[in-house]
Amino acid sequence: MTDLSRIRNFSIIAHIDHGKSTLADRLIEFCGAIEAREMKAQLLDNMDIERERGITIKAQTVRLNYKAKDGEIYQLNLMDTPGHVDFAYEVSRSLAACEGSILVVDASQGVEAQTLANVYQAIDANHEIVPVLNKIDLPAADVPRVKQQIEDVIGLDASDAVEVSAKSGINIDGVLEAIVTRLPPPKGDAAAPLQALIVDSWYDAYLGVVVLVRVVNGELRTGQKVRFMATGATRELDRVGIFGPKKMLVDRLGPGEMGFVTAAIKDIRDTKVGDTITEEKRLAPTPLPGFKPSIPVVFCGLFPTDAADFEDLRESLGKLALNDASFQFEMESSAALGFGFRCGFLGLLHLEIIQERLEREFNLDLITTAPSVVYRMHMNDGTMKEMHNPADMPDPVKIDRIEEPWIKANIMLPDEYLGGVLQLCTERRGIQKDLTYVGGRAMLVYELPLNEVVFDFYDRLKSISRGYASFDYVLEGYREGDLVKMSILVNNEPVDALAMIVHRTQAEYRGRQLCERLKDLIPRHLFKIPIQAAIGGRVIARETIAALRKDVLAKCYGGDISRKRKLLDKQKEGKKRMRQFGEVEIPQSAFIAALRMGQE
């Protein structure tokens, strides 16, 4: 077991694309944890989606042994964290397991919105922070300006920031020395009752549930009988190991160390992330402070295109929820789409990633309904209901007022794009709170309704600013809004999957847009199909799909007009009856395209 004074637990935090995972690769390479022939870029990003999109989704851990300049060998436990706003929960869990952070800032781009958000999380976790300036070999790198920015915007002393290039491998030993000399060692007592924090858990087809732990007090050993304090489940450990970066089994894990344990756990609900593991025969007096549970902000329905896949979808969601503690789901049914699940996500990228993982890893074909947020309905009788699905909205007569969630957004961008971004925020009912300039970049603080952000705000922001703006938000609370439920009727029948809550001022525009889209997507039938958007009983937009005409006069060559008239009248009668009883088939592709409308 390593002496506590020679252990360093640290995480790497940064904005998207500032080079966290590349720096992690270089640290692994420098410490010789993996042979050169097995080395590959973004070594710790082991999901296909992560490698393709070039983003980190799951926080990963690895143990490195580093011989420092003072001659001692140090055990470094590294957590590589995601940079995207939707995965902030992964970051908060990683930070809780460490004592220090390396803050990576791109020397050409400077401090971005997500840099700020992650730094504030690290400061809340009482971390010692070492600033590292990456990409110093780029022609556009401006080290003095970025150092000044770190001091002005974040308030960290950047005079002794480590200057590196992770890609070229310049000054990597400088980072390792800074970790050893400037970050604090963990505290803990090997003789105390066992307390180990569950940082993450995932399902392995051979081992059952694999639990990633950080030992605080006591020690974990193979064959030990342990109890999960939140669920009360008891298990005997059959494996104790570390990631280095491959799985390696060890006899024990002591205080301050990170590793994994397995105990033939089948039920994924036994291992709650943030729970404390203790020894069955020497229970710890109190559990460790866990993480604040994440609150989903975006909800949408996931339905299998083939109803026979419903059970597979349920099982797949269970396995994903184990690996992603911030993802929640419950069963729902829809008249248009059959049985499926109402799922809660941290944001739109999170939704997209979960959908893509279900389709790839579990070979499922899915339909996603329009994303919505959680509204609070204050009823006339004084009760308050939360509504996740617009189709479940009670009768408007019974509702006193509706409240919607608002966010406080930090937007950082080059000042030449400021006009377009201000206009975008105003269109989305935003309230400007602050505008400051830091060396050619503007920092905007806006309050916005979350409903306006979940559709396509991020994409629009990126296109207006040519990709230079960065965006981060925190939930502010609920405020009353003039909100209405917009129903879509096809052939006078409401389609529950297309119902949405909109602000009254935007209802007509949204309704017209959706009706026009559906008109192009629903195939023509032998009778006329009206498509309407309605608020309550009032129709606000309408499009009509013309009927296909069957030529009933094809076989009448010349002849008497009354014969033709009889055939035409008979056709007219049939069409009238058809319009009354005919079913309109809305193809799946029309649903998917209509639901994607808001995201374009």
Swiss-Prot record:
Swiss-Prot/TrEMBL catalytic activity: GTP + H2O = GDP + phosphate + H(+)
GO CC annotations, alphabetized: plasma membrane
Record-linked SUPFAM superfamilies: EF-G C-terminal domain-like (SSF54980), P-loop containing nucleoside triphosphate hydrolases (SSF52540)
Domain of life: Bacteria
Enzyme Commission code(s) on record: 3.6.5.n1
CDD domains: EF4_III, LepA, lepA_C
Ranges where the tr-type G domain occurs: 5-187
MF GO annotations: GTP binding; GTPase activity; guanosine tetraphosphate binding; ribosome binding; translation elongation factor activity
One GO process term, biological-process aspect: positive regulation of translation
UniProt keyword list: Cell inner membrane, Cell membrane, GTP-binding, Hydrolase, Membrane, Nucleotide-binding, Protein biosynthesis
Binding positions (GTP): D17, H18, G19, K20, S21, T22, N134, K135, I136, D137
Localization, UniProt: Cell inner membrane
Spans through the membrane: none
Membrane topology: Peripheral membrane protein
InterPro entries linked: EF-4, EFG_III/V, EFG_V-like, EFTu-like_2, G_TR_CS, LepA_C_sf, LepA_CTD, LepA_IV
Main location: membrane
Stated role: Required for accurate and efficient protein synthesis under certain stress conditions. May act as a fidelity factor of the translation reaction, by catalyzing a one-codon backward translocation of tRNAs on improperly translocated ribosomes. Back-translocation proceeds from a post-translocation (POST) complex to a pre-translocation (PRE) complex, thus giving elongation factor G a second chance to translocate the tRNAs correctly. Binds to ribosomes in a GTP-dependent manner.
Similarity comment: Belongs to the TRAFAC class translation factor GTPase superfamily. Classic translation factor GTPase family. LepA subfamily.
Name of the molecule in the record: Elongation factor 4
Organism of derivation: Rhodospirillum centenum (strain ATCC 51521 / SW)
Gene name in the database record: lepA
